[in-house]
Each structure stands twice: as structure tokens, then as C-alpha cells.
């Protein structure tokens, strides 16, 4: 669904709601967006995820029409809108600061885009009442933005963006100013509303939890390019790069060299200590310098009551730190303590009292293991 051949992708995906075809945007010599090609299915919730400066907001601004690409094309429902002004694209937009008119009531804020489109008063009144009911603000139509909570202001902005029935809703960090509890509640509400209205959403955020909670499709950007595109589960369980593995959540990255291939696409990787790791990936070749990604929750931890096994994916170490997460414990384990130059720290996540009813303490000797299908071989990032 992502490719460098923007022209062929545009033809193949003309039925999709949104197609970005080889978009570029520069500021002087700085490349903000470099050759982004992407197709987003109609009715899907697509999150563009990345750190500050990754180009995600620039992509959204080009899609909205607030910024013009240096080259490339933007299609919405098969129509080229690259050079159209924002008001002719029929897109709803919600920003982090909501951009509500402080001198207007809730009703007038929501009615504003309808009045700009020249609708009759009776139709405006009906659409506004219906939309305010949808966002559960039917009794707040006469209030002003300053009289509302942050969550209520966000709902007004959302109602204003949806009241004219846009083809696509664009959202730039819309929950960023809210506290964690309210943010979590509104994530659920927003996803439910998107499904109910069957609107295509493009949602920019740096928050991995928001992407995992709401998105049907996730785009991860870094340095102006797309690192990976897929479902949240695909990106979490099957990252293609070290950056994606780390950005989608905590992970252990263990360096090594591919030394062989086992059955079912499992690779054999040798760590500098001589320990063998088995992990998934069909694209790496023998001799490649790689990193193996293993999520902390996939690492089994038990007391080292017997000599360490020589089996692959079986390591010994000592607890360096133990942190309670409420329903679970996160352990930091130093592995390879007999060879200081090759020591690494690994993370493991276990239930409060461990799989065998034991809660581990700092400096306790432990054994770590994981399944080959829970580990993924990734190309080593250049340093």
C-alpha cells in the first residue's frame, strides 16, 4: 500500500478515499517531506504517527490545502485536489487548540461552516441540533467556549468539523491538551463516532497509545519519510525497522549476526557472547549485521535454580531494577555479567508475583527465555 512508484499506485488505488502520490515539501535545503506515497481506504481511521519533526503535520497541512507540495499529487475520492484551496476540498479539520471563536456561542461555532456555505436557516438549525446531540452537547448550545471544559471544547470543534458532512476529517493532535483520563475517554468516543458516521479520518499524533487504541491503519513517519504502514497490530508485532520497533512500544534490541536459517522462516542469529537467538524474518541473509527485537511482555522470567540452558533464546542474568506498574512488574535484567564489555540490559514484564508465584528482587539471579515466533530480526540501524 506504500510504494515509491506513486503513479502506478495512484492508478491501482483510485477507488480509495485518499491517495498521496510522491509528495515532497522543502523549506530551503531542509526536506520536511521526501517522496511520501500512501493510500487510505474510505471509512478508515488512519493515524500518522511520529516524533516531532518527522513530517507528519506537514503531510496533514498539504492534505488540508494549507501548504502546497513542491511536487506530487493529492487525490480524494479519485479527484486531484493538489492545487485546490482548502475551502474547495470539503474536509473537516480539528486542531489541538480547537480554534473556536471565543465571541460565538457553541451553536454559532457549529453553524459557522454551514452559514459560509449559504444554507437556509431552517436547515442550519436542524443540522446543528442533530450534531450537538451526536457529541452530547445538546444542552450547551447557548454557552461560550470559555464556559466549557477542555473536553467539551474538543467536542464543539469536532461537531463544527463534521456538521457539513465532509468526505474526510483531518485531526492534528486534537487530544494533546487534555489530561490522561479524559484523553482515554475521548479516544473511545471519537472512534465510536467515526464508525457511526463512516467518515474517513486522518489523525496526526506522537502518542503511540492513541494509535493503538483508535487506528485501523497506522503510518509511522521519521525524517520526512514513511518507515512502515499497516495495522497497529502489524506494526507492533512485525516491525520492519529498529525505529518502528522502538516507537511502537518498549522493546529489547539484541545485536548479532545471521549465521543460518531454520525451518518456517526462522533465522539463527549469533550474539557476540556466543549465545544463539532464533527469531522470525525471511528477508535477512546469512552474514547480515542485525538486531533482534523482543517485547518485554514476551520474555519469560524465572528464578535461576539450575544451570543455564544452552538452548537458543535462553539467557541468564541478574535483576538490576524492579518497578511496579500496578497490574504488572517491569524488570531490568543485566545479561552477560561475566563479560563486562558484552553486557546488555534487557526488560521483562510479568504479573505482580511472576509466573511461578515469585516476585523478584534486585540482584537476584534469573533465567530469561522467549519463543522464536515472538522475536523479530531487523536490519541494524546505521550509527
What would you call each of these model-derived segments?
Residues 64:
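Helix-to-loop junction immediately C-terminal to a conserved catalytic motif
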Residues 45, 84-246:
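ABC ATPase nucleotide-binding domains
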Residues 72-80:
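Conserved ABC transporter NBD signature motif
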Residues 70-73, 123, 223, 255:
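Conserved coupling/switch loops of ABC nucleotide-binding domains, chiefly the family-specific signature
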Amino acid at each position: 500500500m506504500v510504494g515509491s512508484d506513486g503513479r502506478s499506485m495512484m492508478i491501482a488505488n483510485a477507488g480509495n478515499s485518499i491517495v498521496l502520490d510522491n509528495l515532497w515539501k522543502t523549506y530551503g535545503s531542509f526536506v520536511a517531506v521526501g517522496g511520501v506515497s500512501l493510500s487510505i481506504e474510505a471509512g478508515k481511521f488512519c493515524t500518522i504517527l511520529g516524533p516531532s519533526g518527522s513530517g507528519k503535520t506537514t503531510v496533514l497541512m498539504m492534505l488540508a490545502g494549507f501548504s502546497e507540495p513542491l511536487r506530487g499529487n493529492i487525490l480524494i475520492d479519485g479527484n486531484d485536489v493538489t492545487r485546490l484551496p482548502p475551502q474547495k476540498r470539503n474536509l473537516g479539520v480539528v486542531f489541538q487548540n480547537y480554534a473556536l471563536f471565543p465571541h460565538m456561542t457553541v451553536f454559532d461555532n457549529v453553524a459557522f461552516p454551514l452559514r459560509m456555505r449559504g444554507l437556509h436557516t431552517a436547515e442550519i438549525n436542524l443540522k446543528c441540533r442533530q450534531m450537538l446531540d451526536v457529541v452530547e452537547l445538546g444542552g450547551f448550545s447557548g454557552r461560550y467556549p470559555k464556559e466549557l471544559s477542555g473536553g467539551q471544547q474538543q467536542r464543539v470543534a469536532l461537531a463544527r468539523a463534521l456538521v457539513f458532512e465532509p468526505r474526510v476529517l483531518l485531526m492534528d493532535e486534537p487530544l494533546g491538551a487534555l489530561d490522561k483520563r479524559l484523553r482515554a475517554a475521548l479516544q473511545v468516543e471519537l472512534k465510536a463516532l467515526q464508525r457511526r458516521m463512516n467518515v474517513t479520518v486522518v489523525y496526526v499524533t506522537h502518542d503511540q497509545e492513541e494509535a493503538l487504541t483508535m487506528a485501523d491503519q497506522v503510518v509511522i513517519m521519521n525524517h520526512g519519510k514513511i518507515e512502515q504502514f499497516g495495522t497497529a497490530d502489524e506494526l507492533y508485532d512485525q516491525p520492519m525497522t529498529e525505529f518502528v520497533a522502538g516507537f511502537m512500544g518498549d522493546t529489547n534490541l539484541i545485536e548479532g549476526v545471521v549465521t543460518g536459517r531454520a525451518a518456517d522462516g526462522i533465522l539463527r542469529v549469533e550474539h557476540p557472547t556466543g549465545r544463539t537467538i532464533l527469531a522470525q524474518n525471511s528477508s535477512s541473509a546469512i552474514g547480515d549485521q542485525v538486531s533482534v527485537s523482543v517485547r518485554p511482555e514476551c520474555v519469560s522470567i524465572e528464578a535461576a535454580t539450575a544451570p543455564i540452558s544452552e538452548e537458543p533464546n535462553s539467557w541468564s542474568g541478574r535483576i538490576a531494577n524492579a518497578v511496579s506498574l500496578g497490574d504488572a512488574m517491569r524488570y531490568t535484567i543485566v545479561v552477560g555479567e561475566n563479560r563486562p564489555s558484552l553486557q546488555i540490559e534487557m526488560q521483562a514484564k510479568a504479573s505482580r508475583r511472576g509466573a511461578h508465584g515469585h516476585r523478584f528482587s534486585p540482584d537476584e539471579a534469573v533465567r530469561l527465555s522467549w519463543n522464536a515466533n515472538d522475536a523479530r530480526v531487523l536490519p541494524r540501524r546505521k550509527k
